[in-house]
UniProtKB/Swiss-Prot annotation:
ATP binds at residues 12-14, 266, 310, 314, 411. ADP binds at residues 12, 16, 266, 310, 411, 415. GO terms for molecular function: ATP binding; glycerol kinase activity. Coiled coil: none annotated. This is Glycerol kinase. The lineage of its organism: Bacteria, Bacillati, Chloroflexota, Chloroflexia, Chloroflexales. The keyword Nucleotide-binding applies. It comes from Chloroflexus aggregans (strain MD-66 / DSM 9485). Keywords: ATP-binding, Glycerol metabolism, Kinase, Nucleotide-binding, Transferase.
């Protein structure tokens, strides 16, 4: 009898397939990186074909490592880098252009034109999002405007849009031969095209953005059987879809109003469960769908999205060559006692929450001859913690709820220096769970829930346990002095791009 749930976790830098048992433990997994394509400054692309090839490869690899076959898997869920935009031919499966990645800033002109009538918050009341290069709608518009024949093909229904979840679900369920063209509410809520109240595409916004409705996928719940897989997972129900940050909320079992988590990946993303209530933000956060299980009402969240955190460590490694592996940043940072008076604001693709400034670019401030590479490494880690503090402050303002602890996950949570500094600068305990692969786990939970492998959220919550807690050890005066320095540094990034 099938006794495991599988997740495909398609992230910004790599794709994983993870297989979990009923207790939420990882049984086996496989992972492969894919190429980051930078055609021009501010442009970031992926090859959709390479991503699909990597996906098939990691499914094979995970099954093989676990000595398993498709018959051992009850269901498969998909979680994905959100906003990243693919437009492809529904007859051949061929993309008309590379995937335009969430960090890509090429749509700034489109966003400015749209904001000329009604400002950056023109659509916020309906979609919960500001006009920003981050979201999919303007990326679709760019492809339709710039790829020859794309608009005509879209209007004729020959080419279709999807975020990565949609593209993978379509291929997993047969591609050109009957592939299912769907997206879940969490991914749809990141396009700028879905109305948060109706959970359907908004015709007025589609018309303003110039996007034909017929190219869009059907919006479905995050947990239900969408179709059956072909290929390596032949016969397995494809039954869960969640954007990566929403998947981490489910994996962290943040099912109650007021529960929050922060995921440290390429960027960092803090979400706060607001229940079935849509809470508009006055502090630069996003209002987003957290999850929708079957025919139960949708649950919403406030989100603070930070563009660059883990990516800054990669930059230190790949662009400066100061370290050879990302893990070495901790040892380098520990060569010094503090940041030597420097702050590093990584506005490589503008600033996301709570500023939403696409004109910002990265700065290192406070440099003196005293500063060495250890200070630089420490400033790199501290940047992640300071940006998280800004988001936490905004969340407390919007929700009126004071956070008592922060659940954390993602690759950087094994960096003790960073996690201790995070607790210090927030002034609240930081908690790492036993299973830190919460994004994949959330997708597996959504899929397993749809087929009855887990009968309810209480069963999932029972699986959650604490691995490590960091408590604040910094005095209030030091905390606020350091944070003031950060706020000052951030202002130096503004108005850089004309």
């Amino acid at each position: 009898m099938a006794k495991y749930a599988a997740a495909i976790d398609q992230g910004t830098t790599s794709t994983r397939c993870m297989i979990f048992d009923h207790s939420g433990n990882v049984i086996c997994y496989d992972q492969k990186e894919h190429e980051q394509i930078y055609p021009r400054p501010g442009w970031v692309e992926h090859s959709p074909d390479e991503i699909w090839e990597r996906t098939q490869s990691v499914i094979r690899g995970a099954l093989s490592k676990g000595g398993l076959s498709a018959s051992d898997i009850v269901a498969v869920g998909i979680t994905n880098q959100r906003e990243t935009t693919v437009v492809w031919n529904r007859k051949t499966g061929r993309p008309v252009y590379n995937a335009i990645v969430w960090q890509d800033t090429r749509t700034d002109q489109i966003c400015n034109e749209l904001a000329a009538d009604g400002g950056q918050d023109r659509f916020r009341a309906k979609v919960g999002l500001p006009l920003a290069t981050y979201f999919s709608g303007p990326k679709i518009r760019w492809i339709l405007d710039n790829v020859p024949d794309a608009r005509e093909a879209a209007e004729a229904g020959d080419v279709v849009f999807g975020n990565i979840d949609t593209f993978l679900t379509w291929w997993l369920t047969g591609g050109p031969n009957g592939g299912v063209h769907v997206t879940d509410v969490t991914n749809a809520s990141r396009t700028m095209l879905m109305n948060l109240e109706t959970l359907d595409w908004d015709d007025e916004i589609l018309s303003v953005m110039g996007i034909p409705r017929q190219m869009l996928p059907k919006i479905v719940p995050s947990s239900m059987v969408y179709g059956t897989a072909v290929g390596e997972l032949a016969g397995v129900p494809v039954a869960g879809i969640l954007g990566d940050q929403q998947a981490a909320m489910v994996g962290q079992t943040c099912f109650d109003v007021g529960e929050a988590k922060n995921t440290y990946g390429t960027g960092s993303f803090m979400l706060l469960n607001t229940g079935t209530k849509i809470v508009p933000s006055k502090s630069g956060l996003l209002t987003t769908v957290c999850y929708k299980f079957g025919d139960q009402p949708a649950v919403y969240a406030l989100e603070g999205s930070i563009a660059i955190t883990g990516a800054l460590v990669q930059w230190l490694r790949d662009n400066l060559g100061l370290i050879t592996t990302s893990a070495e940043v901790e040892a380098l940072a520990n060569l010094v006692e503090d940041n030597g008076g420097i702050y590093f604001v990584p506005a490589f693709s503008g600033l996301f929450a709570p500023y939403w400034r696409s004109d910002a670019r990265g700065v290192i401030v406070g440099l003196t001859r005293y500063v060495n590479k250890g200070h630089l490494a420490r400033a790199v880690l501290e940047a992640t913690a300071y940006q998280t503090r800004e988001v936490l402050d905004a969340m407390e303002q919007d929700s009126g709820v004071k956070l008592t602890a922060l659940k954390v996950d993602g690759g950087m949570v094994y960096n003790n220096t960073l996690m201790q500094f995070q607790a210090d600068i927030l002034g609240v305990p930081v908690i790492r769970p036993k299973v830190a692969e919460t994004t994949s786990l959330g997708a597996a939970y959504a899929a397993g829930l749809a087929v009855g492998f887990w009968s309810n959220t209480d069963e999932m919550r029972a699986n959650w346990g604490v691995d490590h807690t960091w408590t604040p050890q910094m005095d209030e005066a030091t905390r606020e002095r350091l944070y003031r320095g950060w706020k000052k540094a951030v202002t130096r990034t503004f108005d850089w791009v004309e």
